[in-house]
Amino acid sequence: MSKVYELVSEYQPSGDQPTAIKQLLEGLDAGLAHQTLLGVTGSGKTFTLANVIAQAQRPAILLAPNKTLAAQLYGEMKSFFPNNAVEYFVSYYDYYQPEAYVPTTDTFIEKDASVNAHIEQMRLSATKALLERKDAIIVASVSAIYGLGDPESYLQMMLHLRRGDVIDQRDMLRRLAELQYSRNDVAFERGQFRVRGEVIDIFPAESDQDAVRVEMFDDEVDCISVFDPLTGVVKQRDLPRYTIYPKTHYVTPRDRILEAIESIKVELEVRKKQLLENNKLIEEQRISQRTQFDIEMMNELGFCSGIENYSRYLSGRSEGEPPPTLFDYLPHDGLLIIDESHVTVPQIGAMYKGDRSRKETLVEFGFRLPSALDNRPLKFEEFESLAPQTIFVSATPGNYELEKSAGEIADQVVRPTGLLDPILEVRPVATQVDDLLSEIRIRAAKEERVLVTTLTKRMAEDLTEYLHEHDVRVRYLHSDIDTVERVEIIRDLRLGEFDVLVGINLLREGLDMPEVSLVAILDADKEGFLRSERSLIQTIGRAARNIEGKAILYADNITKSMKKAMDETNRRREKQQAYNEKMGITPQALKRNIKDIMELGDITKSKRQRNTKQVPLSKVAEPSQTYEVMSPQQLEKEISRLEAAMYQHAQDLEFELAAEKRDEIEKLRAQFIANS
């Protein structure tokens, strides 16, 4: 059998990786429903998973706990499988305010959302890859458990074009309109089509680089070509066939919509009767008015605002049945890999309950029909029943994963680089701040970085202020900072803009930096969420990528959580040392390129190919001395160019590069004022 998954890497599995790969593959072959990969920070878990996918030759969905981690994982998988369909599936909302009602103040909040068109295209591309190709790898966030269009309706709505087909041009344009494509003969954009005589150009919704040209000869499809929508250059000509996918996952055939409308009318009458019997006259009038308006819109346009609330009827499902999700698109032999499972699994369980309470209020007060409750994410039990063979991945697996895996745990403790887990020390709380200050000075002198985690926001602020007063270059990472700023702060820490980062919950994944040689945990003996065994292990692991890695736990007592965390860290360290001695390995310091700290994948490969070669981070613009001799007009032009590049990087989720461009723009603006 020819291999469809082709792993491309200059590295070979080493350390604990070969054993973990072998164990996971044997478990898959044996039909095990659940396995766990216990992989420490920096042990190459992603490379292990890539090897498992390549050797198993099976499509996979990789679930990550947030968009940032999903994008990192996507970038890594894209580099390991450049010739396969690695796709990205996360929530496409830049901003989302769900429909809600607050009874105490009689306030109704309309649904409001801002959709990221680029991520919407990637979602469509992901489902297309699952339907068309045998080599799909989908990196997704927990939004994958939310309702998606029914695969059967989606497949029914496709427009199949074949050379030689006889089809009236008007019929083709009507079919495109049914797929929710709009006609635009002026500005040709994704999800649109244009008509020029007997030539119809279609920009597929799932593509960011190719458009399709259909040339007609009277009522016959004469030629199908693929061309670049930007330059007009034809890439492929005389294709025998081409399939146009719907613009959205939520398209529904006309006959299904008409059936749904009849069912909605029946439910409306039942609901109105219930409300009148309970003397809820306002609610009865409200539900009648809102539903009748939606029915009119669906009759005339084929959709309405909030059409997802009628998904039970549109997908033909019974009351209480799980909604169609991304898992319905996954082939029967697919794999599910849950990254950072100690965070992701609880998220999956929490989604349904939060959504349900909001919708029950809307139903009770007549804003929605009871069937709207079936527009929901999967319940945890439904997720369990739908999930294919699953591999949990974490440095600190939760009780659920350990219980489900029933001892099938692949231990990946030894790092290929030979790096050891940090040395642990426990010091008294009474002198923790002064002791920390002296430790920081030692690290700063060696140009190393320090992470400090506190228990409260107040303490973090006070400590930051204290360190600042003592001439320590320090920053404070708090919950109000968004993803982009967070990436920027991490980059600045690695670049040496400051030496110490203080925070409350610094165990969030993605904070792995080789420059960090010390992690200080203040008040480590205060039992609780932030000082649990898993939290402590995760926090200690932030120093695991440095050859001089050390963790200091400030505590007056050794709690159960501390003891377990210290025992586990020491167990790992002993195993790593024994392996290094046996194999004659000398630990090597990681020298990870700064620009790669949050490299979120080559998300728009085509755009990169069209652009000039990637500019190194240190040379994102010309040297400042060149700007000094520029005229104001030249500076203005250069600022515009950099702004365009900055927005492009932000759209492509390359926050690192966007931040660099922004810094350069600020310098230019200062120079512009000076030169004016």
Curated annotation (Swiss-Prot):
Residues 636-671 form the UVR domain. ATP binds at residues 39-46. A motif (Beta-hairpin) lies at residues 92-115. One of its GO terms (molecular function) is ATP binding. Residues 26-414 form the Helicase ATP-binding domain. Keywords: ATP-binding, Cytoplasm, DNA damage, DNA excision, DNA repair, Excision nuclease, Nucleotide-binding, SOS response. GO terms for biological process: nucleotide-excision repair; SOS response. The keyword ATP-binding applies. Forms a heterotetramer with UvrA during the search for lesions. Interacts with UvrC in an incision complex. Belongs to the UvrB family. This is UvrABC system protein B. It comes from Vibrio parahaemolyticus serotype O3:K6 (strain RIMD 2210633). The gene is uvrB.
